[in-house]
Amino acid sequence: ALKNKKKLSNGKFSAMGVSVISHPKNPHVPTSHMNVRLFCLFDSDDNIKDWWIGGGYDLTPYLPYSDDIKDWHKQAKHFLDSFDETYYKNFSKECNDYFYIPHRKERRGVGGIFFDNEKDLSIENSLSFLENVAKQYLNSYLKIASKRKDTEYSLSLIHI
């Protein structure tokens, strides 16, 4: 995230983030990941000189259910459209590109959203956006997990 940012003379910065990774025992409940982060660069008087946010979330089902996947993306689009109607298209593409595995010629999982170096909103609104990304992730993921957590499975599915 720092590669396109110019260096400040004092080199002070702060990076804060929260990551959540879920690897459930039941293979009918997908693995998922969520991350939100804020970076700040400071001038010699310790004032914020520059800042940006990043984050996202993605879903990697062991046993894909098309209705879960469609709803996952539908909820992400609905949420992001309330901020900016270009966000879903851009952030979904970023997720697909970020989680592409070249030697397999495939993506990891079924997608989600990913963004970095974002600074479209004020810092206050950006922090609110990050909070809402985390809440949206929890709502979307828990909806799937709650629906699938009691689905029976054989021990052979654990060793996929």
Please name every model-derived segment:
Residues 159-160:
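Conserved small/polar residues in nucleotide/adenosyl-binding loops
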Residues 1-53:
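Internal mixed beta-strand/loop scaffold within catalytic domains of large alpha/beta enzymes
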Residues 44-155:
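Long, contiguous internal "core" modules enriched in hydrophobic/ aromatic residues
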